[in-house]
């Protein structure tokens, strides 16, 4: 779990398989990820899969820097990459737009010229202009000739098309998004375009693909649902304050169950609790166990992406919470209390990649159920997960 500031970046590694899930900001790659990938490459290892869970600057900045630095897939300046999962507009629609009228072209050009958000590179010495005018993720994947969504990027990664990807020592199972959630993202894009004055049919080409990605990088900054609504002194429960997240980009997150070398991980990206709950209940009805070896909590520990109902179905001895608290005050203390205050025959460990007011507060919390837990802050070194330590 990398120190990705308010973002996400995870590298999962076994003797046979390496998976990078999101990349935080470009500074996350420059300062941390790049070194680890070069060490893997020196051992003749590759990235078997790179998952970009959804379009958000705090998840994709480091991946953009990786692909820009790595060059063509045949050149691989840093490391060989076998497959990249990323749902761009190219992956979501088959309607090709070959030409645009001048007034619609102006709308697309304006979105592209705005570039990436200013905070896209959080490294103070990084040139802001180059960060904002840099290539989009979709452009870099396509130009680099990478295997994209198992083929050429024209297929989406969703529960309706891709359920499982196999590796030598395990698999990745897709839990979200559904095709319906991806359709909602397209609808949100269409609504944005109409608001900007775009009048023609909404299709896809390289410029429109770029505009799609850049638009959602910016739109994700606009709304932070519910933060700072609950006073720290209220001590309200998650049941009292939980409301479902309604972000179309978060709803498009690629959430997965990853099984490698006998270890089961639940990686929830920024996914919606209701979508995850539906899938895990379906799997549970088929006889699958919903006890994992580790769970990456959704959306940096937000109260609005992990419901009490979901917590009643899933559990693990290890929880990963990725946030420095710099935006939206994540993680939320109500969620942290709800995680640890459940009866269990084992001790839970909460791993935070930073020390935040909430991580310090939860240290002193006394679970009413008598459940025991440990808090590990600044947990950015390798975390070894072994089956013997699990339940």
Where are these regions (language model features)?
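Active-site metal-binding motif and surrounding structural segment of the metallo-beta-lactamase
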Residues: 31-84, 285-304, 313-320
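Flexible, acidic/histidine-containing loops and adjacent segments that form or flank the divalent-metal
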Residues: 71-264, 353-355, 363-391
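C-terminal regulatory/interaction regions
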Residues: 5-8, 259-261, 271-292, 309-313, ...
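Conserved beta-strand hairpin/beta-sheet module of binuclear metal-dependent hydrolase folds
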Residues: 1-46, 248-274
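Active-site environment of divalent metal-dependent phosphoester hydrolases
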Residues: 6-8, 26-28, 55-61, 91-92, ...
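Pre-active-site segment of Zn-dependent metallo-hydrolases
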Residues: 19-50, 64-73, 184-190, 196-206, ...
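Structural recognition of the beta-strand scaffold that forms the well-ordered cores
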Residues: 11, 18-21, 48-52, 83-87, ...
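Long, well-ordered mid-to-C-terminal structural blocks that present hydrophobic/aromatic surfaces
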Residues: 240-305
């Amino acid at each position: 779990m990398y120190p990705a500031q308010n973002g996400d970046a995870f590298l999962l590694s076994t003797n046979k398989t390496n998976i990078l899930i999101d990349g935080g900001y470009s500074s996350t790659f420059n300062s941390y990820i790049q070194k680890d990938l070069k060490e893997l490459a020196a051992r003749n290892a590759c990235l078997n899969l790179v998952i970009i869970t959804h379009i958000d600057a705090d998840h994709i900045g480091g991946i953009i820097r990786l692909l820009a630095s790595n060059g063509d897939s045949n050149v691989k300046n840093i490391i060989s990459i076998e497959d990249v999962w990323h749902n761009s507009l190219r992956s979501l629609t088959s309607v090709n737009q070959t030409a645009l009228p001048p007034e619609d072209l102006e709308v697309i050009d304006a979105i592209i010229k705005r570039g990436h958000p200013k905070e896209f590179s959080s490294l103070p010495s990084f040139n802001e202009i180059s960060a904002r005018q840099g290539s989009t993720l979709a452009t870099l994947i396509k130009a680099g000739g990478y295997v994209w969504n198992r083929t050429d990027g024209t297929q989406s990664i969703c529960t309706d098309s891709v359920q499982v990807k196999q590796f030598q020592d395990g698999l990745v199972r897709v839990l979200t998004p559904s095709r319906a959630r991806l359709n909602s993202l397209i609808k949100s894009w269409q609504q944005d375009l109409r608001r900007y004055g775009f009048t023609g049919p909404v299709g896809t080409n390289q410029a429109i693909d770029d505009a799609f990605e850049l638009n959602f990088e910016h739109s994700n900054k606009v709304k932070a649902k519910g933060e700072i609504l609950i006073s720290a002194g209220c001590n309200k429960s998650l049941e009292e304050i939980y409301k479902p997240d309604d972000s179309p980009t978060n709803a498009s997150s690629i959430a997965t169950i990853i099984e490698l070398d006998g270890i089961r991980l639940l990686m929830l990206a920024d996914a919606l609790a209701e979508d995850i709950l539906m899938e895990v209940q379906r799997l549970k009805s088929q006889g699958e166990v919903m006890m994992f070896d580790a769970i990456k909590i959704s959306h940096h520990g937000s109260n609005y992406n992990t419901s009490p109902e979901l917590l009643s179905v899933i559990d693990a001895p290890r929880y990963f919470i990725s946030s420095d608290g710099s935006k939206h005050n994540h993680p939320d203390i109500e969620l942290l209390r709800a995680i640890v205050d459940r009866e269990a025959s084992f001790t839970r460990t909460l791993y935070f990649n930073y020390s935040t007011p909430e991580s310090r507060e939860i240290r002193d919390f006394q679970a009413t159920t008598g459940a025991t837990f440990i808090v590990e802050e600044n947990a950015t070194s390798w975390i070894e997960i072994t089956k013997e330590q699990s339940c």
